[in-house]
Swiss-Prot record:
Entry annotated with the keyword Cytoplasm: no
Keyword Transmembrane: no
Name under which the protein is recorded: Large ribosomal subunit protein bL28
GO cellular component terms attached to this protein's record: cytosolic large ribosomal subunit
Organism of this sequence: Acinetobacter baumannii (strain AB0057)
Keywords recorded for this protein, A-Z: Ribonucleoprotein, Ribosomal protein
GO molecular function: structural constituent of ribosome
Amino acid sequence: MSKVCQVTGKRPVVGNNVSHANNKTKRRFEPNLHHHRFWLESEKRFVRLRLTTKGMRIIDKLGIEKVVADLRAQGQKI
């Protein structure tokens, strides 16, 4: 499974580790992903999403019903 947030679309980015001597080695910055269950009142069931903490804040702001409707409009199976 890829490390992508279902709500925001955030994915890993590539950068450098930089030592005190300014030597650089490649590394990946991973998004802060969590599996989280949300109760959908309209369907009387839980949905499990893989999302970042930013995605959780978006759900707190807009509501899970609106976010799930937007994801389904994009073609994601939820």
